[in-house]
Swiss-Prot record:
InterPro entries: Aquaporin-like (IPR023271), Aquaporin_8 (IPR023277), Aquaporin_transptr (IPR034294), MIP (IPR000425), MIP_CS (IPR022357)
Reaction equation(s) it catalyzes: H2O(in) = H2O(out); urea(in) = urea(out); NH4(+)(in) = NH4(+)(out); H2O2(out) = H2O2(in)
Annotated keywords: Cell membrane, Endoplasmic reticulum, Glycoprotein, Membrane, Mitochondrion, Mitochondrion inner membrane, Oxidation, Repeat, Transmembrane, Transmembrane helix, Transport
Official protein name in the record: Aquaporin-8
Segments on the Extracellular side according to the record's topology features: 58-84, 129-156, 205-228
Regulation: Reversibly gated by a two-step sulfenylation-persulfidation process in cells undergoing diverse stresses.
Amino acid sequence: MSGEQTPMCSMDLPEVKVKTSMAGRCRVFWYEQYVQPCIVELVGSALFIFIGCLSVIENSPNTGLLQPALAHGLALGLIIATLGNISGGHFNPAVSLAVTVIGGLKTMLLIPYWISQLFGGLIGAALAKVVSPEERFWNASGAAFAIVQEQEQVAEALGIEIILTMLLVLAVCMGAVNEKTMGPLAPFSIGFSVIVDILAGGSISGACMNPARAFGPAVMAGYWDFHWIYWLGPLLAGLFVGLLIRLLIGDEKTRLILKSR
């Protein structure tokens, strides 16, 4: 008789295994779809802004805009190539806004991405402050954007931030999101757009193009003069580019109008 008896719980064991397996898969899916991308955006933003801030703080008069332009652009391209397949490689609230508008990022992830990018900016700027000599740090205003000093400069600074950010966001969206134009050289193109933007407009507005890049150093240095320019300009550019792609220049899958079906 004892050889024929079956434990009472044995009939439920397969169901328990199935439930456990499904729960495990759900946790992994939730982590990889929602948590891991935010972690990567935080880490990538911290690394990018650390390198960017350090390049400004340690810049010498002889190199002018070239050193920060190369450091920002090369760092961004490298980080996107390394981490982009996990989160999309935004590291910029303006980019995340544009990618959301064209359907490349779930709307529910936009705010978590922004929070991650801003915290990453704080961490990167804090690390740059820690490793920099105090005199150099304050001479460079902690790599905050201090180039706009008078009200008369606001219009041109805001305008150039919009235009420069549009070029960067176009490089991201068309090179890495839009299926018709995306390709393996996207990280290079995105990094190159940052180099070009800083060389072209750095003397006018500082060529920020990224609210997270402005926010972290502003907190560390306590410098908030005309800070709003570096939020409004890039975010407007992200919105404009998102609408441009969504309505006119995106592929058929992305466009909202003139679709064959």
